[in-house]
Amino acid sequence: MDAPRLPVRPGVLLPKLVLLFVYADDCLAQCGKDCKSYCCDGTTPYCCSYYAYIGNILSGTAIAGIVFGIVFIMGVIAGIAICICMCMKNHRATRVGILRTTHINTVSSYPGPPPYGHDHEMEYCADLPPPYSPTPQGPAQRSPPPPYPGNARK
């Protein structure tokens, strides 16, 4: 099933675009009744302020959209460049899973670890705290703390 299509009328879009440019040109350049806010003082028919018109069109949202679009396109280009560089690098090396003999010789040339006679972690260390005893130790004879300097009782 085909989706319903709009009737195609050739030659409709072009006249509308021409009318748009004609009216936009009038408002941009001439001081008519529709573009008084963009006009400056002067006698020439072309006295509209292009900067005011452009500033009105390019609001903060439009500028933010343009900046976001440029940053997005730069990110896409950077991602493509990284992919291309990685593919070029991978094609220069050998295939995955095949090691070069120099790498194998380098790994096998290192000496093995020394033999272990006993487990070093199980050695008794003299710095261990005393074992736990359930009987409480006697109270330590301590002197009372010094009096608080701000509260003197009389």
From Swiss-Prot:
Regions crossing the membrane: 62-82
Residue intervals annotated with topology Extracellular: 30-61
InterPro entries, per the entry: CYYR1
Cytoplasmic side: 83-154
One annotated Gene Ontology cellular component of this protein: membrane
Keyword Membrane set for record: yes
Main location: membrane
Family affiliation: Belongs to the CYYR1 family.
Pfam families on file: CYYR1
Domain of life (superkingdom): Eukaryota
UniProt-annotated stretches for the region Disordered: 124-154
Signal peptide extent: 1-29
Keywords: Membrane, Signal, Transmembrane, Transmembrane helix
UniProt name for this protein: Cysteine and tyrosine-rich protein 1
Membrane topology recorded in Swiss-Prot or TrEMBL: Single-pass type I membrane protein
